[in-house]
């Protein structure tokens, strides 16, 4: 089965009214536009999203829905660094340092909390900066992602040479 668009999200439905099968994804797989996966029940699915969300797939995104059957996204828990800033200045410092490493940064549960995938160098940096943090297991859901840049993404436009020798971007 080939999935070309998202249908909605489980949070907008009552999942008890449906038979839900899940595709388990790691946080870093949620930004793939083209991929093959197996559901928990063993169904093969291919994803070729034409209008993929800029932030990536989110927890509960519905990939397939037919009558009472749904296939939805489940983002697996992963090891994360949970960061707790003490001030707005510390938030700026955290965002700068994490961004400078091109690491993913996610909102936490409250205003001054953030999460980033666990990496020893990042943990050492936060310790060196005196930023309060601890390592835990948590979902990194795309809807909570602060950054939308994709350093290795392909351009979304076609460049061609016009007859008047001007570069045209479509």
Swiss-Prot record:
It is found in: Cytoplasm. The keyword Membrane does not apply. GO terms for molecular function: nickel cation binding; unfolded protein binding. SMART domains: UreE_N. Keywords: Chaperone, Cytoplasm, Nickel. InterPro entries: UreE, UreE_C_dom, UreE_N, UreE_N_sf. One of its GO terms (cellular component) is cytoplasm. The keyword Iron-sulfur does not apply. GO terms for biological process: protein folding; protein-containing complex assembly; urea metabolic process. Pfam families: UreE_C, UreE_N. Involved in urease metallocenter assembly. Binds nickel. Probably functions as a nickel donor during metallocenter assembly. Belongs to the UreE family. NCBIfam families: PRK13261.1-6. This is Urease accessory protein UreE.
């Amino acid at each position: 089965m080939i999935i070309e668009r998202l249908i909605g999200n489980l949070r907008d439905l009552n999942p008890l009214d449906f038979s839900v099968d899940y595709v388990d994804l790691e946080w870093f797989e949620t930004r793939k536009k083209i991929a093959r996966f197996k559901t928990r029940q063993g169904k093969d699915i291919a994803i070729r999203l034409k209008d993929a969300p800029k932030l990536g797939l989110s927890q509960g995104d519905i990939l397939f829905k037919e009558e009472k059957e749904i296939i939805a996204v489940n983002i697996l828990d992963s090891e994360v660094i949970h960061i707790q800033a003490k001030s707005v200045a510390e938030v700026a410092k955290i965002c700068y340092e994490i961004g400078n490493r091109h690491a993913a940064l996610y909102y936490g549960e409250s205003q001054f909390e953030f999460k980033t995938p666990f990496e020893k160098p990042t943990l050492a940096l936060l310790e060196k900066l005196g930023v309060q943090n601890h390592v835990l297991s948590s979902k990194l859901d795309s809807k909570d992602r602060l950054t939308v840049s994709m350093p290795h993404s392909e351009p979304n436009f076609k460049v061609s040479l016009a007859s008047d020798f001007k570069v045209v971007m479509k």
